[in-house]
From Swiss-Prot:
Coiled coil feature spans: none
Cofactor remark: Binds 1 zinc ion per subunit.
Record-stated family: Belongs to the FPG family.
UniProt cross-references to NCBIfam families, sorted A to Z: fpg (TIGR00577), PRK01103.1 (NF002211)
Official protein name in the record: Formamidopyrimidine-DNA glycosylase
GO BP of this protein: base-excision repair
UniProt cross-references to PROSITE patterns, sorted A to Z: FPG_CAT (PS51068), ZF_FPG_1 (PS01242), ZF_FPG_2 (PS51066)
UniProt source species: Edwardsiella ictaluri (strain 93-146)
Annotated keywords: DNA damage, DNA repair, DNA-binding, Glycosidase, Hydrolase, Lyase, Metal-binding, Multifunctional enzyme, Zinc, Zinc-finger
């Protein structure tokens, strides 16, 4: 699933081609995604795109009348292509520009979304989200306050979007390893020093992934069609049975709900 670094990588890739340009119209070949494609999108004609933003894992295209809100789902990606590029099997939506280019949305598993909101204040999908992890609002003090009394394992707790957005399975595993915190530790047991270190490692891991164009494990591609390269730097995720790169201990895997967790039993306490 594309996580925050992949979505931010996509935003940075498409923004120069969309921002300040004019939307001609949209072509929707498959409206049945996670939620039905908003019918308003089919009525848009010759509208300027004012900005290309991101909130959590959502891409936000600002138009004068409202916002196109895009979620990449489990397997989605967006690319900038010439408008006459023939569609392939899983190319479900094209946003065509008046300059002869287009934004193409590809989603093999069709679990993404293309929605319309007159205002972000009414965007139900953005309600109740926690702070951005790379913002000043996500601090050690904030994390420690939220952790107080929590008897939830720290790994799934970090993945709760009401706590902080965009720390998905890959980056929660990698951040906990870097902070040397066992994923089964209770959130409420974190010390002030551990909270400080964990916040710093989350920010560092996410920033490194953004700098590397995200993590491509299966379907994700950058806006130019290239994969992300952070997968080559993963320390524990997907490495069960292999030696820890720090101490040589065998990397273990466990389940938290439906998510697989990877960790080093020696480095993480």
């Amino acid at each position: 699933m594309p996580e925050l670094p992949e979505v931010e990588t996509s935003r940075r890739g498409i923004a120069p081609f969309l921002q300040g340009k004019t939307l001609s119209h949209l072509t929707v070949r498959q409206p049945r995604l996670r939620w039905p494609v908003s019918e308003t999108l089919l009525t848009l004609r010759d509208r300027p795109i004012l900005s290309v933003q991101r909130r959590a894992k959502y891409l936000l295209l600002e138009l004068p009348e409202g916002w196109i809100v895009i979620h990449l789902g489990m397997s989605g990606s967006v690319r900038i292509l010439p408008a006459l590029t023939p569609p392939q099997k899983h190319d479900h939506i094209d946003l065509l520009l008046t300059d002869g280019m287009m934004l193409r949305y590809t989603d093999p598993r069709r679990f993404g979304a293309w929605l319309w909101y007159d205002s972000l204040a009414t965007a139900s999908v953005l309600a109740h989200l926690g702070p951005e992890p790379l913002s000043e609002a996500f601090s050690a003090e904030y994390l420690l306050e939220k952790a107080r009394g929590r008897r939830t394992a720290v790994k799934p707790w970090l993945m709760d979007n009401t706590l902080v957005v965009g720390v998905g399975n890959i980056y929660a595993s990698e951040s906990l390893f870097s902070a040397q915190i066992h994923p089964d530790r209770l959130a409420g047991s974190l010390s002030a020093d551990e909270a400080h270190l964990l916040v710093q490692t989350i920010k560092a891991v996410l920033q490194r992934s953004i700098d590397q164009g995200g993590t491509t494990l299966r379907d994700f591609l950058q806006a130019d069609g290239k994969p992300g390269y952070f997968a080559q730097q993963l320390q524990v995720y997907g490495r069960a049975g292999e030696a820890c790169l720090t101490c040589g201990t065998t990397i273990k895997r466990s389940k938290h709900g439906q998510r697989t967790t990877f960790y080093c039993p020696h480095c993480q306490r």
